[in-house]
């Protein structure tokens, strides 16, 4: 009979936990530091819905979600290496031309059906022509809300500066400025505007969905380091993201509950927003060259950049379309 030495037994006992640790390490989720350019966005609640539906777990990803007070602040975090992947505005692609080490990797949301220009309920402003020369609050300079305000002014024939743009960050700060008489209105999530209407505090005078038919309201960006050193993790993230979009299209009730928590409005409002906006979400992240041209040319037209960047310098098409 074969004799088993004490050394063999001890060695096996020591090796077993090492094998287990090795397997656990292999199965450990990849952490992604994920940022939203603003916190209370129905479109950006996709990340939270993916968490609630355990889609990130299925993709072996631990998503560490943070939110900022606008595109410019998120771009600072991307530059500082504090964020791996972010969701921000289409015009925010222009930050690449300013030296931010991040680039668009997937289209996310088409024309801005999710944004409104809101005034106080008591405001004398009733229609768009009343906005000439008025002070409109946006999140940050160079952000989507800035871009939309300047584009609206330009379309009205007033030039890009026919409406005064004031960057005041998050909605509470802008609403307070309106109540003090320091602002005449603000560009915000339509859902938040509906909530202010129900509270008797505000009034949406327009939605921005028709301002540009070929356009990206929101895009997904990734840092150069993420693209170069963790491309497969990025691919898994994008697969999880668009799996979540597919789930959202098929499960309105589930989406409404999570969306209401994230956007911090009533479920009845999120239900209304869902019906109006779900069709604007990209299903695979593929880029529309016409929309890219609209954005890059507008960056100079509206004074956000002093030149028109080359298309390929602001987006990367190697990761899309995404198959789920």
Where are the predicted features?
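Generic structural marker for isolated residues within well-ordered, non-membrane alpha-helices
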Residues: 52, 149, 193, 256, ...
């Amino acid at each position: 009979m074969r004799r088993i030495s004490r050394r063999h037994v001890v060695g096996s006992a020591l090796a077993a936990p090492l094998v287990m640790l090795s397997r656990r390490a292999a199965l450990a989720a990849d952490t992604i530091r994920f940022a939203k350019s603003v916190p209370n966005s129905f479109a950006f609640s996709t990340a939270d819905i993916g968490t609630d539906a355990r889609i990130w777990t299925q993709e072996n990803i631990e998503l560490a979600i943070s939110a900022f007070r606008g595109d410019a602040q998120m771009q600072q975090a991307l530059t500082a290496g504090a964020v791996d992947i972010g969701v921000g505005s289409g015009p925010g692609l222009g930050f690449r031309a300013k030296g931010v080490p991040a680039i668009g990797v997937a289209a996310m949301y088409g024309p801005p059906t999710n944004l409104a220009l809101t005034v106080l309920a008591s405001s004398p402003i009733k229609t768009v022509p009343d906005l000439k020369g008025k002070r409109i609050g946006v999140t940050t300079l160079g952000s989507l809300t800035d871009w939309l305000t300047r584009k609206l002014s330009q379309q009205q024939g007033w030039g890009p500066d026919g409406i005064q743009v004031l960057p005041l960050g998050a909605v509470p700060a802008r609403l307070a400025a309106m109540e003090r008489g320091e602002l005449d209105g603000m560009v915000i999530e339509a859902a938040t505007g509906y909530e202010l209407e129900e509270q008797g505090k505000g009034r949406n005078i327009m939605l921005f969905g028709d301002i540009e038919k070929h356009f990206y309201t929101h895009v997904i960006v990734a840092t150069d380091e993420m693209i170069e050193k963790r491309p497969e993790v990025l691919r898994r993230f994008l697969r999880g993201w668009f799996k979540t979009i597919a789930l959202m299209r098929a499960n309105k009730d589930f989406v409404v509950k999570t969306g209401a928590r994230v956007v911090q409005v009533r479920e009845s409002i999120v239900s209304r927003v869902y019906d109006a906006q779900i069709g604007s979400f990209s299903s695979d992240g593929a880029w529309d060259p016409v929309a890219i041209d609209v954005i890059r040319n507008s960056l100079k037209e509206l004074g956000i950049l002093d030149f028109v960047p080359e298309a390929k310098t602001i987006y990367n098409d190697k990761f899309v379309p995404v198959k789920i």
